[in-house]
Amino acid sequence: MTETPTAQPDRAADADTPQHRYTAELAGQIEGAWQQTWAVEGTFNVPNPVGELAPPDGTVPADKMFVQDMFPYPSGEGLHVGHPLGYIATDVYARYYRMTGRNVLHALGFDAFGLPAEQYAVQTGTHPRTRTEANIVNFRRQLGRLGLGHDTRRSFSTTDVDFYTWTQWIFLQIYNAWFDRDANRARPIAELIGEFESGVRTLDDGRPWSELSAGERADVVDSYRLVYRADSMVNWCPGLGTVLANEEVTADGRSDRGNFPVFRKRLRQWMMRITAYSDRLLEDLEVLDWPDKVKTMQRNWIGRSTGASVQFGTDAGDIEVFTTRPDTLFGATYLVLAPEHPLVEQLAAEQWPDDVDGRWTFGATTPREAVAAYRASIAAKSDLERQENKTKTGAFLGAYATNPANGQQVPIFIADYVLIGYGTGAIMAVPGHDQRDWEFAHEFGLPVVEVISGGDISEAAYAGDGLLVNSDYLDGLDVAAAKAAITDRLVADGRGRARVEYKLRDWLFARQRYWGEPFPIVYDSDGRPHPLPESALPVELPDVPDYSPVLFDPDDADSEPNPPLNKATDWVHVELDLGDGLQTYTRDTNVMPQWAGSSWYELRYTDPLNKEALCAKENEAYWMGPQPAEHGPDDPGGVDLYVGGVEHAVLHLLYSRFWHKVLYDLGHVSSREPYRRLVNQGYIQAFAYTDSRGSYVPAAEVVERDGKFWFEGAEVFQEFGKIGKSLKNSVSPDEICDNYGADTLRVYEMSMGPLEASRPWATKDVVGAHRFLQRVWRLVVDEQSGAVRVANHEALDTDTLRALHRTVAGVSEDYAALRNNTAAAKLIEYTNHLTKEGVTARAAIEPLVLMVAPLAPHLAEELWRRLGHDTSLAHGPFPVADPQYLVTDTVEYPVQVNGKVRSRITVDADAGKDTLEAAALADEKVQAFLNGATPKKVIVVPGRLVNLVV
């Protein structure tokens, strides 16, 4: 980046370089050799209690640990230096605990299905599978260079048939289950059918089960399933040819992938009933060792609120409204429905009432025309856009509803700030006490009634507490009492009930694409879905020559999805015997969303070779089962440490928790949560540069001169942000490994700052980590001769003993707490001490090599071997601190004169007040400030300070 050459180690030794110096070339040779040794010896392979990975005698260590990374999507660009941050951190953690004797499971797979691979394939004409497999090979090569201690037998890709067989199997378990609200858990659908057949459970309409036709029974059962089809409002993206989950749509109503317009459209789609688990998903956040930020994000996403359901009567039937403020019902002066509400068509009148306010008509000649025009005007808006603070818009339906509190007729509008996905898709508008309603009322000339005293509703809505007014029998009550009283009255009148509502919506679980897991579902000639038997799995994704999605004009909101699998006609139409003879069925041509594989992959790491089950119960219980003795009586179980980016706080983590809880309810796993502990790593950021047009230029070719930055002779402008291909500031880990070695990259990334914090990348600073490793090397190896320079029987002086054991204690604590940056700092300090004092004693240097091993494993293994050991240090032992050397002999005290620190003194740790006072008065700096004066008072605070008052 600068015109001044950056210091880099020579890849090959020149004439002036000692023959046995730790150079980039030597580092590369050492790293390659040890990676091969680890692979051949299976150094990081860990045993399972049962199955193919079990030892012959079936015994496994009781002290296990399961460490997991959020697995990568194998993109075509490969890794940049920001990607390995979390992988290296977990490797350091796993290596440390492995050296302390723990049986550590650490493996890494690939999340390879989904839109990115398909989009790239469409652009290049390469089949998604071909490109994905090539990308995985490159990722494995790049990750392999880093020396990550993974059990490679447990690696997989979500696109492997052996993996997605079990994704389909889990789908069938969820499909063939229902949520028993009385038991607050999922149960097999067969048990529900048994209850209907026995009469234990009856139909809501009172019909006997025996009188229902087969089709009617199927409809009832399907309405209970945890997976169901529904006509629902979805996010349709014509430019991608698929529907998207809410989480895949940006705030400005465009697709996160490709930046295409997204439209709200009603389609029949597969849904997963995640809302049934809302309370449990909330409650179990309390027992998880997760960042508070992530817990808050999940709580907000689930969005639990308590209130009342209120029925407003209309000519088209009752409109159900959910409100958290039933106490304000007397102040409801109009209703607003989401434009997509199913009653809109029935309510919209043929003509406007006499003397209708022109502001209410949306410029249309009839209410029905107003509805059509208004819907068209908001079709491309995202939910967030619809709720932004702006001028309120809407249209009157030409219809009225009856307020159940006072019997008054109130007009009914549609408006975009009411969403069909929350509550009932209808609100009672109380403009006196809700600011959005107040703004809408002022825009449309609607009445504003005060029902809570304490504010000036002529200026703005009053949302505070107060006593009820203008509310009949509620007058004089406080808000809490009024809520209870009005809810009781609504229940008594049959016009409402107490209710809990959630923002969380059921999970849209289908995509109209090619590159995803096929559904194990077929349809009969009547269009009724049937789950395939488990024996029919896997349903393999067919190889088709035309896998591109059916795309539309990005602005064509009226287009309809046409999944690419429809083109595979030989695959789509299949003859099966599902219990009633051989019949022709049609396969479901949607595929699962990209979140499917990542919603359960932690379980497959525990038993990746099992062909008979998702994972053996013994293996899941060993690696993920609850451990009340270690983690407390309410331990939910799960992976011991999960590390990944905070961007997955809601989607992936919420979906995986949902799937795991269903599997727990059905008895397939012993843990009720997938991840016991979560840590979000920060990001590695870097400078990027733009020219006068705002276009990014290659950061590696920018030079700095006189405080300005130049590219090809023209001035460019520096900015700071993420590393990436689009910003042209990407740095490949291959480049750093080539120029310094993988161990240097590991040490540099770990020493840049706390794991959770983002940090700036600076290639010019990498050399500092390399020089540290060179100093460690020189403590063991003579650079001139290559001989080991360690003395076997040299005794350690007291200072070195203290430095050693304090380093061991501090580094152990730091590794366990993922404070790798401070661990590195302590190791550098100890290395400097040994170098400065010329220590060559084996007793001082071998512990250093062991402590360095989690950070720089290749170097440590090589030094360990040169020190005469014939086994790997990967399994320890990690040094243990001797407590006698951790005692502090001296203490430093600040000395204040009239409250300001003027000096510092060092005294024995057990020094008394008299000694402290004498030492403070004898200090030269203090004497200078006293200038011969005698202090009026000396205040000694043991362990903290000395203050002289003059």
From Swiss-Prot:
It catalyses: tRNA(Leu) + L-leucine + ATP = L-leucyl-tRNA(Leu) + AMP + diphosphate. ATP binds at K725. It holds the Pfam family tRNA-synt_1g. It comes from the Bacteria. It is an enzyme of class 6 (ligase). Keywords: Aminoacyl-tRNA synthetase, ATP-binding, Cytoplasm, Ligase, Nucleotide-binding, Protein biosynthesis. InterPro entries: aa-tRNA-synth_I_CS, Leu-tRNA-ligase, Leu_tRNA-synth_edit, M/V/L/I-tRNA-synth_anticd-bd, Methionyl/Leucyl_tRNA_Synth, Rossmann-like_a/b/a_fold, tRNAsynth_Ia_anticodon-bd, Val/Leu/Ile-tRNA-synth_edit. Signal peptide: none annotated. One of its GO terms (cellular component) is cytosol. PANTHER family: LEUCINE--TRNA LIGASE, MITOCHONDRIAL, LEUCYL-TRNA SYNTHETASE. Belongs to the class-I aminoacyl-tRNA synthetase family. This is Leucine--tRNA ligase. It comes from Mycobacterium sp. (strain KMS).
